[in-house]
C-alpha cells in the first residue's frame, strides 16, 4: 500500500496546513473539518493514511500521535447552518473555522478536493489529497475521530438511531428509525430522505 508523504509540502516553502472534512454525506450531525501543520516535516508517524482506509482503533492511535506532535485546528458547521445554506457552503465554512482555530501564520493551505474555502492564505486544491499529502491525511484522521466522538455523544441522547454505529449516514437501519421515530434537531432537513419525511 502506498502511503501519503510530504512530497507536496516539500515543493512549497514555509508553514503549510493540510485541510480535510468529514461528514458531508450523513443525514444527521454536523460537518467537521480539521487543519494540521507539521512544523517539522522530518516527523515520521507510521501508518498515516486517508481516514477511510483505517480501522477505528488505528485512527484513534494515530489521532493521539498526530495531536502530540503537530499543530491542529478544528472547525464545525452545525446542522442549522447546513439547513440554512447548503452542504457545500457549510463545508467551506467548517474548513475556514478550522484554519482560524489553528491560529498560525500560514504560507500555504493544501485542501482535499476541488472546492476550497475562500481564505486569506494561498490555497492549493488537491484531488485525492488525503491519499497524497501527509498533512491532509492527518487532517482527515483528526476530523474523523472528532466527529465520531461527537456522534457518540448524540447517540447517547438518541440511541434509537444508532448513530454510534452509522455516524448519521443513511443506512437502512437509520432510515427505518426515522420512519418509526421521526426526525430530531440533529437531522439535516434539506437532505432528500429527511425532506421527504417532513
UniProtKB/Swiss-Prot annotation:
Domain RNase H type-2: 14-198
EC number: 3.1.26.4
Reaction equation(s) it catalyzes: Endonucleolytic cleavage to 5'-phosphomonoester
Cofactor: how and how many bound: Manganese or magnesium. Binds 1 divalent metal ion per monomer in the absence of substrate. May bind a second metal ion after substrate binding.
Gene3D superfamilies the UniProt entry points to: Ribonuclease H-like superfamily/Ribonuclease H (3.30.420.10)
One example GO MF annotation: manganese ion binding
Coiled coil region boundaries: none
Superkingdom in the source lineage: Bacteria
InterPro entries (alphabetical): RNase_HII, RNase_HII/HIII, RNase_HII/HIII_dom, RNaseH-like_sf, RNaseH_sf
Cofactor(s) the protein requires to work: Mn(2+); Mg(2+)
Binding site for a divalent metal cation: 20-21, 112
Gene Ontology CC annotations of this record: cytoplasm; ribonuclease H2 complex
PANTHER family xrefs: RIBONUCLEASE H2 SUBUNIT A, RIBONUCLEASE HII
Family from the record: Belongs to the RNase HII family.
Name the record gives this protein: Ribonuclease HII
Organism of origin: Wolbachia sp. subsp. Drosophila simulans (strain wRi)
